[in-house]
Amino acid sequence: MKGDLGTFTADLSRWQAKLPGQADLLVQGFSQTVFNEVQSGGKYSPGTPIASGFARANWDGGVGAIPSNPPTITAEAAEANPAAGRAAAAEAGRRTATAILTAKAGDRIYLSNTARYIRRLEFGWSTQAPGGFIRLALNSAQAIADEVGAFLVKRGLRGAQ
């Protein structure tokens, strides 16, 4: 697909064995953590660089199909009012979280961004993330899966009661 910045999988099977009946929760937690790393940053990625908030506001998530929601703010509006751009980015995060909560084990989950310059940001256009942010999160997928699985086990989520 044109513009595809990566496809990845992580092995969740060992955690599924430790979390019987909780495979959906494991997939949801993993997917949300990857999204958070890409959009806002965290342990593995600095997140999408933010000036006006437009690039962060353009993230969208979907389950089973590439999402096609239109951006909630234009580049011009975000540049004129960065606070509105950041608010739109927060809304994009909430919209994606809502989509991820519908995911089931085995579903394909998509993250997309329609900002014209997202690829340039990923490949060093911004001094905020010169080493990228998408690839850093994707390259850490297994570590993220292991952290989410360990967190759920620690919380005592051993299966449906």
Language model regions located:
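Protruding loop/beta-arch "assembly-hinge" segments enriched in small, turn-prone residues
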Residues: T127-Q161
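Short, intrinsically disordered N-terminal pre-domain segments
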Residues: M1-R14, Q161
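Short, low-complexity, charged/polar segments at coil/turn and helix-coil boundaries
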Residues: A10, R14-L121
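Globin-like tetrapyrrole-binding proteins
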Residues: G124
